[in-house]
């Protein structure tokens, strides 16, 4: 489920930002929000986190600031954003569309794309590519597991990395 926010004060807004996405999301969805308006205000907050969690949403990714991050953490509701902020969106940013194509960090995201997120970052994949990407990621993870095992067995880092260097340089498209 996607949401697009822009800067400014809406002429007429029939609803609070992101609420339609919360109510339209299927159980297990992640809400992804384009909030590249340039306005330093929250595009997501605590009440939305509770509403989303109650409706079965698994988490939120916002390309911009979010507020009430500690509250979301206490709920066990993942919120991944560019930065925390206390300033609300009221009169500063509003929703222009949801369940639409958006851009996150220069990457095209459409409803139905798969989202992987953790404290290291966020990845968006077209659903058709998930199986292949997971297969390749498993291969990389196994190689890294063996490298760590060798280091713990006493091998020198230059040797371990050196043995794997050429493969590590290979970009997987």
Regions found by a protein language model. Give the residues of each.
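Feature captures the catalytic cores and cofactor-binding loops of soluble hydro-lyases/lyases
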Residues: 1-111, 125-173
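C-terminal binding/interaction regions
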Residues: 115
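Channel- or pocket-lining gating/hinge segments that regulate access to a cavity or pore
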Residues: 121-123
């Amino acid at each position: 489920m996607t949401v697009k926010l822009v800067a400014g004060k809406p002429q007429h807004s029939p609803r609070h930002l992101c609420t339609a996405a919360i109510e339209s999301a299927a159980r297990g969805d992640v809400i992804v929000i384009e909030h590249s308006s340039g306005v330093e205000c929250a595009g997501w907050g605590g009440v939305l986190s509770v509403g989303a969690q109650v409706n079965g949403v698994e988490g939120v990714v916002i390309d911009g600031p979010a507020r009430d991050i500690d509250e979301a953490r206490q709920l066990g509701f993942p919120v991944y954003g560019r930065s925390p902020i206390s300033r609300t969106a009221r009169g500063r940013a509003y929703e222009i569309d949801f369940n639409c194509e958006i851009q996150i960090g220069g990457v095209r995201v459409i409803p139905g794309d798969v989202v992987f997120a953790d404290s290291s970052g966020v990845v968006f994949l077209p659903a058709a590519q998930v199986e292949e990407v997971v297969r390749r990621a498993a291969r990389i993870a196994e190689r890294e597991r063996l490298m760590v095992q060798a280091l713990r067995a006493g091998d020198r880092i230059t040797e371990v990395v050196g043995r794997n260097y050429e493969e590590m340089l290979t970009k997987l498209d």
